[in-house]
């Protein structure tokens, strides 16, 4: 996904960019919340070479079958191409995940976000997109009318387009998708409960959201100490079922142990946990990634664990950011050796 942005419900020409005015950019975090996964491969390395590229890719991602789809008037003829183009742009879903890697050309995937708004994804060679089963989406080429994609499957696919409507809403895949979409976020220490366990997905909204949470917690526990543990970890890769960050996988049980120790020290109601998932596509190779430049987080690598406690005058401070009320007592990437019991 080279870029993504929100588009209106109705568009006059599907092959135009159709941005809102003013433009409203999408984000990797909004896509992640909708369970869409994105990964980029070097465009020079992707091809329809079965032995040289496709078979090694299938093995790496633990997929078992594939096909190559070449859409253009030159390959299909004008009439068949336009008929397929109309069909692909109907809002629909599938009973299996849709995994597409762009080999040549470019086009737009439109997907519904968690609030049922359209996000348009500009997809070029090297872009790999995973759309979960049960998610409404549609596709169109741009005005070039030419795209070649590799589709890969875990098993033999049930590749039937289910157009949006009452019958599709009752399909198991759709119900399961909605259940996952609205389920509490899972963290290293349990499901988020908006009480003592939180998961915030949007880096650009972090300060506003955490400032509200921090102020409320300080008011609730005005006479007793509390501690906030922040865990920055790689988000889950649906092609493998695990974090894209290898070091983050063994770190999770270690974080759970450190948090249990924090609960023992401060009490279960006053030990607060916040997990911040880090999206691979937005983070890797990006020195401007918000958590890297954040004055308190100062993310250098994942996983990273921080523990913060209120400043002495935290309760007296007026309208300030969360990081002005809290001070960092511990910051580490070596979570197994972190000593939360010695915090003052």
UniProtKB/Swiss-Prot annotation:
Its EC number is 1.13.11.54, 1.13.11.53. It comes from the Eukaryota. Gene3D superfamilies: Glutaredoxin, Jelly Rolls. Binds either 1 Fe or Ni cation per monomer. Iron-binding promotes an acireductone dioxygenase reaction producing 2-keto-4-methylthiobutyrate, while nickel-binding promotes an acireductone dioxygenase reaction producing 3-(methylsulfanyl)propanoate. Pathway: Amino-acid biosynthesis; L-methionine biosynthesis via salvage pathway; L-methionine from S-methyl-5-thio-alpha-D-ribose 1-phosphate: step 5/6. Ni(2+) binds at residues 92, 94, 98, 137. The keyword Transferase does not apply. This is Acireductone dioxygenase. It comes from Leishmania braziliensis.
């Amino acid at each position: 996904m080279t870029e993504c942005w929100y588009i209106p419900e109705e568009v006059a020409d599907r092959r135009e960019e159709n941005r809102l005015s003013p433009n409203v950019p999408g984000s990797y975090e909004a896509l992640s919340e909708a369970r869409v996964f994105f990964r980029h491969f070097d465009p020079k390395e992707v091809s329809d070479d079965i032995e040289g590229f496709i078979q090694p890719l299938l093995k790496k991602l633990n997929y078992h079958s594939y096909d190559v789809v070449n859409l253009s008037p030159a390959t299909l003829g004008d009439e068949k191409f336009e008929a397929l183009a109309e069909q692909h742009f109907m809002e629909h879903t599938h009973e299996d995940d849709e995994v597409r890697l762009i080999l040549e050309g470019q086009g737009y995937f439109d997907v519904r976000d968690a609030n049922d708004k359209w996000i348009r994804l500009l997809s070029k060679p090297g872009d790999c997109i995973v759309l979960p089963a049960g998610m409404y989406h549609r596709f169109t080429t741009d005005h070039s009318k030419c795209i070649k994609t590799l589709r890969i499957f875990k098993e033999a696919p049930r590749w039937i387009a289910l157009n949006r409507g009452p019958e599709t809403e009752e399909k198991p895949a759709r119900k399961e998708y909605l259940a996952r979409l609205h389920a509490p976020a899972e963290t290293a220490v349990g499901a988020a409960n908006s009480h003592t366990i939180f998961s915030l997905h949007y880096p650009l909204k972090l300060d506003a959201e955490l400032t509200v949470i921090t102020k409320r917690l300080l008011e609730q526990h005005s006479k007793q100490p509390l501690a906030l543990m922040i865990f920055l970890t790689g988000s889950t890769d649906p092609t493998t079922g695990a974090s894209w960050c290898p070091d983050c996988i063994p770190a999770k049980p270690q974080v759970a142990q450190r948090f249990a120790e924090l609960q023992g020290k401060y009490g279960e109601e006053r030990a607060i946990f916040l997990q911040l998932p880090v999206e691979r596509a937005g983070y890797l190779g990006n020195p401007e990634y918000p958590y890297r430049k954040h004055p308190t987080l100062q993310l250098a690598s994942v996983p990273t664990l921080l523990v913060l406690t209120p400043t002495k005058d935290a309760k007296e401070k007026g309208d300030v950011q969360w990081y002005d009320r809290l001070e960092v007592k511990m910051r580490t990437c070596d979570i197994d050796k972190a000593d939360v019991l010695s915090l003052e």
